[in-house]
């Protein structure tokens, strides 16, 4: 089955690259709510076009609306987490293609992972593969600033999941990422002399 999936993805490589290019050229830093809405719209359209699945877009007070869709049936659920915001301001990085590589804002973190997730579902559907589980996907728009608006939604979706995986693309040499260092923010106040 693995070879069948790989052959399918290789056959559709040009389309996969076009989908990644579409999302990368739709730039949006976490702080640009209007640009985030445009990226989210492109993402929802791409999910529908490629997988045939409908998306649910959560309302979020500050506009960082998470997008959810699912595929498959079964008792067990696997949750896939990703984000469509980038840390870079619009125009900070240029998009370019070189050999079989794409470069630009969000290619590596994490639009490559979003496109991989979407094409995984498309491959399963087109090849008639039943994952035997419910695959649920949640993509947020505020990850780069700590997921303040979406963390509660993600935690709620994770409660009944057998496993949760982040759609982080592999490293440059193809290794799977299984952990990361994380981030801590704190304030230190000093009084006195």
Protein language model regions, located:
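Sparse, context-dependent recognition of short Cys/His-centered cofactor- or disulfide-binding micro-motifs
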Residues: 8-9, 24, 40, 54, ...
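Acidic/His- and Gly-rich active-site-bordering loop/insert found
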Residues: 2-107, 126, 131
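Short, charge-rich amphipathic segments
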Residues: 1-5, 55, 83-88, 136-154
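Fold-level recognition of mixed alpha/beta catalytic cores in primary-metabolism enzymes, strongest
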Residues: 98-99, 112, 116-119, 126-193
């Amino acid at each position: 089955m693995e070879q069948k999936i790989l052959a399918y993805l290789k056959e559709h490589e040009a389309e996969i690259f076009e989908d990644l290019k579409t999302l990368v050229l739709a730039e949006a830093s976490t702080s640009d709510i209007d640009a985030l809405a445009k990226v989210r719209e492109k993402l929802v359209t791409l999910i529908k076009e490629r997988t045939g699945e409908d998306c649910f877009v959560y309302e979020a007070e500050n506009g960082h609306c998470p997008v959810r869709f699912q595929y498959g049936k079964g008792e067990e659920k696997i949750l896939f987490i990703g984000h469509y915001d980038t840390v870079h301001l619009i125009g900070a990085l240029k998009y370019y293609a070189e050999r079989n590589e794409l470069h630009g804002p969000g290619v590596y973190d994490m639009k490559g992972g979003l496109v991989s997730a979407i094409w995984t579902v498309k491959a399963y559907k087109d090849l008639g593969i039943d994952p035997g589980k419910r695959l649920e996907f949640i993509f947020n728009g505020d990850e780069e600033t700590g997921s303040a608006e979406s963390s509660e939604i993600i935690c709620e979706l994770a409660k009944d999941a057998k496993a949760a995986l982040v759609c982080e693309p592999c490293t440059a040499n193809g290794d799977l990422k299984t952990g990361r260092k994380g981030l801590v923010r704190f304030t230190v106040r000093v009084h006195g002399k």
